């Protein structure tokens, strides 16, 4: 079965056909390090790490570029407010993002370019746009001429977001010298006290959109397979990337993939709303692999509504996989099931893929209970293969090395708690409510919360 992905550009499911057979090229809009990473930031990293892992598992050689926007208005403002040099400020938080990605088992990118290291490529890109008649210099800045581009044959401006030009607001603060209200800055003229770089049009610094076109095409070529990012980047950032890239003569990305937000009480997690939960804060509640499991458990195009209950339920789900594999112990990864493959090839339907993993875990536990060790090993090998694609294989060195003692302790605890839960289930079936309540209360006194679900009871440690 061929991988089908939802292409935002065409608003349809499309078969993935890489430009070069056996290879895949992916560009992901990475961090703008201005503050501590929160779980909304890293959801994108986890979502497209799963895409990358699935392509690798299919035998493709994947070139994966994730940029760092290390200069922009917000970084300069934050650094100034805190009395710190801008480069020190951004370096501090870039390290925190790297730490967060590593904690969650996100594979390092093939290359992680910084905007400030690619000014030469940006200058070349701007010159091409000026030569083609789609950009102009004005008082030290360089702007993209939206009117000229929309009037050009083959222009598709607005097609990604579905917006009409007259409805678009670019949010640019610079207006001096702009020919049109919708034009956006490719290069911003130097201001006193701000960092700047020399160009033929004057000293200044990069505009937000230009950097990604320049870096993506520098490392992946003028045409590459997939461009990824958060839904909030669809407009204006990705729309403008497409415009300037096509206007420069590049085919750019063949597929566009966007992950949805993490929300709290229906609101997008955002620093401006004050509803963010930092990665270190969440890791006080669960292990890194459990947070990864949680962030990857919803479909990447679905909103992920955060609640502590949902986080702990996801952690309990991971522990069920972990407990089974720990009981089977020494087993190599085998082959995933057909159901898992069909789910992953259906636009990365991770909820279905996880459901298949848990189905196999139940079968494996039944085999162990029946004394069929060979069958249990066969199932465990399949479970390892499937969990590895999602980056949550409990027997992977990443998780064994980082939490070996926690892993064995939790697995042993799970065996004991499951025995108590089985006793409670039997008591409830016999309408022996006193015994059922006694088991629940004893677990609660030990710091364990029991939640009844359609698939049976789950448990989680209280904070």
Curated annotation (Swiss-Prot):
What's the protein here called? Cysteine--tRNA ligase
Oligomer status and interactors: Monomer.
Q: Motif 'HIGH' region: list the residue ranges.
A: 31-41
Cellular component per GO? cytosol
Concerning InterPro entries, the annotation shows: Cys-tRNA-ligase, Cys-tRNA-synt_Ia_DALR, Cys-tRNA/MSH_ligase, CysS_C, Rossmann-like_a/b/a_fold, tRNA-synt_1_cat_dom, tRNAsynth_Ia_anticodon-bd
UniProt: Zn(2+) binding residues: 29, 212, 237, 241
What the record says about family reads: Belongs to the class-I aminoacyl-tRNA synthetase family.
Q: Where is this motif: 'KMSKS' region?
A: 268-272
Query: One of this protein's GO BP terms?
Result: cysteinyl-tRNA aminoacylation
Q: Which organism does this record belong to?
A: Corynebacterium diphtheriae (strain ATCC 700971 / NCTC 13129 / Biotype gravis)
| Highest taxon of source | Bacteria
**Which terms does the record give in the GO molecular function aspect?**
ATP binding; cysteine-tRNA ligase activity; zinc ion binding
| Record's keyword terms, sorted | Aminoacyl-tRNA synthetase, ATP-binding, Cytoplasm, Ligase, Metal-binding, Nucleotide-binding, Protein biosynthesis, Zinc
Enzyme Commission (EC) number: 6.1.1.16
Where in or outside the cell it occurs: the entry states: Cytoplasm
**Pfam families for this protein:** CysS_C (PF23493), DALR_2 (PF09190), tRNA-synt_1e (PF01406)
Source gene?
cysS
The residues the record assigns to binding ATP are: 271
Does Ligase count among this protein's keywords?
yes
Q: What class of enzyme is it?
A: ligase
What note does UniProt attach to the cofactor annotation?
Binds 1 zinc ion per subunit.
Q: Which NCBIfam families match?
A: cysS (TIGR00435)
What catalytic activity does the UniProt entry give for this protein? tRNA(Cys) + L-cysteine + ATP = L-cysteinyl-tRNA(Cys) + AMP + diphosphate
């Amino acid at each position: 079965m061929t991988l089908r992905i939802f292409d935002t550009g065409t608003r349809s499911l499309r078969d993935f056909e890489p430009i070069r057979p056996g290879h895949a090229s992916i560009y992901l809009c990475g961090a703008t390090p201005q503050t501590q990473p929160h779980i909304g930031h890293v959801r994108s990293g986890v979502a497209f790490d799963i895409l990358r892992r699935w392509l690798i598992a299919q035998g493709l050689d994947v070139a994966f570029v994730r940029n760092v926007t290390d200069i922009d208005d917000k970084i300069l403002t934050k650094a100034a407010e805190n009395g710190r040099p801008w480069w020190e400020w951004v370096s501090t938080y870039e390290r925190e993002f790297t730490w967060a990605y590593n904690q969650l088992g996100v594979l390092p990118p093939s290359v992680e370019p910084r905007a400030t290291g690619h000014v030469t490529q940006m200058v070349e890109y701007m010159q091409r746009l000026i030569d083609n008649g789609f950009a102009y210099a004005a008082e030290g800045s360089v702007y993209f001429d939206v009117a000229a581009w929309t009037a050009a044959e083959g222009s598709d401006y607005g097609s990604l977001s579905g917006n009409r030009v007259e409805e678009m607001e670019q949010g640019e603060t610079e207006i001096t010298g702009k020919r049109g209200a919708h034009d956006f800055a490719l290069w911003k003229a130097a201001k006193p006290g701000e960092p700047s770089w020399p160009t033929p049009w004057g000293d200044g610094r990069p505009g937000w959109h230009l950097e990604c076109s320049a870096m993506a095409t520098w490392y992946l070529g003028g045409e590459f397979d997939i461009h990824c990012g958060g839904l909030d980047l669809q407009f204006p950032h990705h729309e403008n990337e497409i415009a300037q890239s096509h206007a420069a003569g590049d085919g750019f990305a063949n597929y566009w993939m966007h992950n949805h937000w993490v929300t709290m009480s229906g609101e997008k997690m955002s620093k401006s709303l004050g509803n963010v939960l930092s990665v270190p804060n969440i890791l006080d509640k669960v292990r890194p692999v459990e947070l990864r499991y949680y962030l990857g458990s919803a479909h990447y195009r679905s909103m992920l509504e955060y609640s502590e209950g949902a986080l702990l339920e996801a952690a309990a789900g991971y522990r069920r996989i972990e407990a089974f594999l720990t009981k089977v112990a020494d087993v190599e990864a085998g082959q995933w099931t057909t159901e898992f493959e069909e789910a992953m090839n259906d636009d990365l339907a991770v909820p279905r893929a996880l459901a298949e993993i848990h189905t196999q875990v139940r079968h494996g536990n039944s085999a162990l209970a029946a004394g069929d060790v060979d069958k249990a090993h066969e199932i465990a090998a399949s479970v390892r293969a499937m969990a590895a694609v999602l980056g949550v294989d409990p027997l992977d060195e990443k998780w064994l090395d980082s939490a070996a003692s926690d892993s064995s302790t939790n697995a042993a605890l799970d065996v004991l708690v499951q025995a108590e839960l089985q006793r409670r289930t039997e008591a409830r079936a016999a309408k022996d409510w006193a015994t059922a309540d006694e088991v629940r209360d004893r677990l609660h006194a030990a710091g364990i919360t029991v939640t009844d679900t359609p698939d049976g009871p789950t448990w989680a440690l209280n904070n």
